[in-house]
């Protein structure tokens, strides 16, 4: 099958309607700068399609034998809890080694992934790539339908009692609304987290998914706990998250389109515990610069709020704003700020603009990646990039402090 053939029912009778629905969404999920046609006809688009094809194969019977066999082939066991209640249900993937005598002697990290707004667990569990990583490197993965921080804490405590969880390595990530739910948990119970990845989000928000502001006490508690943070965004997202030195209103194409291809019959948005009911938006309000304030300086102040939570040196506003006028300085022009270690990496023919910042304690506390030509959709390799960042860290149970020590299953 040619690259573009995936995306049409005429050339892909089996799953083409699903691909066409996602393609329609792609065309409304960017800020006007993306070339979607070239994306789907590129090696990057081909890998995106391969992952989506996996999702389409299993999402309608995600607990069926075919899906279970897929997970066994990855070296994993899948279980669902509270499955009778659509919004209470959650899934855990565990390495098969956990069933062996030797494996039961070990402790296992866990990665929680928060789905996007309104999505079912099934919409993202197969296409992200966490299953292959978990089977290879031996860690657990959990997907919760209710991503509110109180439910996360409840499930985490349950897993800690029932499974051989390494409580020093609890990682949380998500995309879009799932990313803002990560941030909500990050501010409320940071001491229970090792590293986080709120992806497909702006650089900083002072309030949660329900527009509840974080309190001074919560902000100070977060700073005291220190949780390393990574963000992955698309260069062409509808909300224009990059460059970070500029602000633009979210692109409105005059219509709303969903990339969902699976809807559970039990779904009822009026009962969704993660949504605002009766508000201006289903989710939290978009930050807007105050009238009369320079939008570039406002954005750098927000960046430096993020730096402050990580004990990183603030970025110089003049230097960052100057990148608006330096297109020849590609990485800084695209990202709008600078780091301590920077690179333009290439994956599947696309540029991944990447920077790292070390904090005052010499900890690689912040990593930022923006993916060329990507709309508001989890970028290819997002899971791989997050895991590469997460696995560096553990939260020492004795001191409560973050330590850089890479996870390795076979380490004695």
Question: Positions of the model-derived regions?
Answer:
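Extracellular low-complexity, Gly/Ser/Thr-rich intrinsically disordered linkers
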Residues: 362-394
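Hydrophobic beta-strand anchors of alpha/beta hydrolase catalytic cores
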Residues: 111-113, 229, 368
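A domain-start/cap signature at the N-terminus of enzymes
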Residues: 1-108, 147, 173-185, 195-197, ...
């Amino acid at each position: 099958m040619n690259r573009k053939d995936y995306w049409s029912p005429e050339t892909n009778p089996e799953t083409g309607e699903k691909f066409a629905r996602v393609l329609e969404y792609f065309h409304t999920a960017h800020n006007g700068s993306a070339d979607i046609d070239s994306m789907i006809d590129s090696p990057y688009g081909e890998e995106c399609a391969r992952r989506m094809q996996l999702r389409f194969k299993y999402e309608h019977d995600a607990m069926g034998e075919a899906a279970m066999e897929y997970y066994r082939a990855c070296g994993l066991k899948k279980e669902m809890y509270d499955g009778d209640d659509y919004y209470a249900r959650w899934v855990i993937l565990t390495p098969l080694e956990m069933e062996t005598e030797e494996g039961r002697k070990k402790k296992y990290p866990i990665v929680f992934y928060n789905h996007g707004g309104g999505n079912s667990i099934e919409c993202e569990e197969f296409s992200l790539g966490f299953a292959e990583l978990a089977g290879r490197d031996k860690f657990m993965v959990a997907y919760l339908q209710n991503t509110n921080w109180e439910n996360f804490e409840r499930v985490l405590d349950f897993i800690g009692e029932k499974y051989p969880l390494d409580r020093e390595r609890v990682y949380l990530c998500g995309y879009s609304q799932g990313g803002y739910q990560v941030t909500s948990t990050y501010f409320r119970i940071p001491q229970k987290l090792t590293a986080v990845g709120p992806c497909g989000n702006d650089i900083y928000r002072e309030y949660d998914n329900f527009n509840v502001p974080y309190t001074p006490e919560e902000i100070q508690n977060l700073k005291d706990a220190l949780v390393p943070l990574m963000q992955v965004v698309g260069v062409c997202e509808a909300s224009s998250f990059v460059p970070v030195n500029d602000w633009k209103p979210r692109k409105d194409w005059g219509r709303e389109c969903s990339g969902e291809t699976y809807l559970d019959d039990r779904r009822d948005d009026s009962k969704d515990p993660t949504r605002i009911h009766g508000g201006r938006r289903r989710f939290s309000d978009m930050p807007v610069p105050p009238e009369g304030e320079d939008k570039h300086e406002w954005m750098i102040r927000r960046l430096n709020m993020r730096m402050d939570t990580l004990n990183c040196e603030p970025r110089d506003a003049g230097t960052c704003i100057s990148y608006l006028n330096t297109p020849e300085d590609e990485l800084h022009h695209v990202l709008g700020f600078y780091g301590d270690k920077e690179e333009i990496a290439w994956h599947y023919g696309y540029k991944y603009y990447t920077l790292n910042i070390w904090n005052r304690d010499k900890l690689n506390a912040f990593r930022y990646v923006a993916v060329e030509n990507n709309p508001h959709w989890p970028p290819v390799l997002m899971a791989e990039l997050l895991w590469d960042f997460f696995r560096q860290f553990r939260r020492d149970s004795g001191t409560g402090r973050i330590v850089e020590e890479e996870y390795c299953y076979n380490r004695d």
